[in-house]
Amino acid sequence: MWSPVFLRYVLDPSKLKEFEHYGKLWFPLVEKFGGKHHGYFLPSEGASNIALALFSFPSLAEYEQYRQKSFNDPACLAAFKYAEETKCFISYERTFFRPVFSA
């Protein structure tokens, strides 16, 4: 069963374009390491400083492998650097879920 990972970002509302670019960098990277990216969700109505992302890996162990490998991958390092340079988000929190479906 796939392990969903939910990210909640606190954004700098003046840097939504930069954050959108940052998010788009991660789609191929998550998939490169065996995950499925389900999208970034940017502010539309309501709070203008919160964004969400959802992706999943076949297991928590595979997610942990992705995390370790991302710290040595040139494209991942470039994405981390972009976020650091643009300061497009202030903070984020990561939560793991288990899906529940109807019987």
Residue ranges and their predicted role:
Residues 21-38, 56-94:
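An amphipathic, aromatic/His-enriched active-site/gating alpha helix that lines ligand/cofactor pockets
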Residues 2-9, 52:
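Active-site-flanking beta-strand signature of metal-NTP-handling nucleotidyl enzymes
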Residues 8-12, 55-59:
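Short beta-strand-to-loop capping motifs
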Residues 46-49:
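Short acidic/glycine-enriched loop/turn segments that link adjacent beta-strands
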Residues 40-43:
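Short, solvent-exposed loop/turn elements at beta->coil junctions and helix N-caps
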Residues 10-21:
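Short, surface-exposed ligand-recognition loops at beta-strand->loop->(often short) alpha-helix junctions
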Residues 92-103:
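Short, low-order "capping/linker" segments at domain edges
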Residues 3, 16-17, 29:
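Short acidic/polar alpha-helix capping motifs at helix-coil junctions
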